[in-house]
Design a protein with these regions (language model features):
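Amphipathic alpha-helical repeat scaffolds
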Residues: 27, 47-51
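N-terminal "domain-start" segment that seeds a small globular fold
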Residues: 13-36, 56, 121
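Bacterial Sec-dependent N-terminal signal peptides
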Residues: 1-17
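Structural microenvironment flanking redox-active thiols in thiol-disulfide oxidoreductases
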Residues: 54-120
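Proline/glycine-enriched tight loop/beta-turn segments at coil->beta junctions
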Residues: 38-43
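Thiol-/selenol-based redox modules, centered on thioredoxin-like
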Residues: 121-124, 129-177
Length: 177
């Protein structure tokens, strides 16, 4: 019975957080970015690429971030080279590109895999219902958007071609919790 009590104690100490807030990842400068600091904020996670037909969305993403960041909204960019090698640069090159061409100030993370067997754990969470309790999904292209509520749960998955400043997204940012 002592063994049973010990195993119950150990299992109760294991994190059962099934929100985005459980993650710590490297940002584009190599520093740790702790998603638990986003509790109480709405979050858009978007996989990005510098040489894509949708790269122009950086401009809309930055405008959206500038306009709504004071309303507890944040955009997190995850560069990825998973779609036709459209993000070949290093983290430094990606950041320079984003700053010089689009004035990006929203948080950018280190380049990761968003699909396949080496998919980053945060994208495993975003795409697997067993981890996110919302739905299974696939990242279909660069600039797919995941809208995360203040509790760290996925509420919407937005197609890559949908502009960041679309009515659907703006309405989600500005309405309710």
């Amino acid at each position: 019975s002592i063994l049973l009590i010990m195993s119950l104690t150990i299992s109760s100490q294991v994190s059962t957080d099934n929100s985005i807030h459980q993650f710590k990842v490297a940002d584009i400068s190599g520093n740790i970015f702790d998603f638990s600091e986003l509790k109480g904020k709405k979050v858009m996670i978007v996989n990005t690429a510098s040489k894509c037909g949708l790269t122009y969305q950086y401009e809309s993403l930055q405008k959206l971030y500038s306009q709504y960041k004071d309303l507890n909204f944040v955009i997190i960019g995850f560069p990825s080279n998973d779609f036709l090698w459209q993000e070949p640069g290093s983290n430094d090159q990606i950041m320079d590109f984003c700053e010089q061409n689009y004035g990006v100030t929203f948080p950018m993370m280190s380049k990761i895999k968003v699909k396949g067997s080496k998919k980053h754990p945060i994208y495993q969470f975003l795409t697997e219902k067993s981890k996110n309790e919302f739905k299974d999904s696939k990242v279909t292209w660069n600039f797919q958007k995941y809208l995360i509520n203040k509790a760290g749960k996925i509420e919407k998955i937005i197609a890559p071609k949908t502009r960041p400043d679309s009515e659907e997204i703006v309405s989600w940012i500005t309405n309710g919790d």
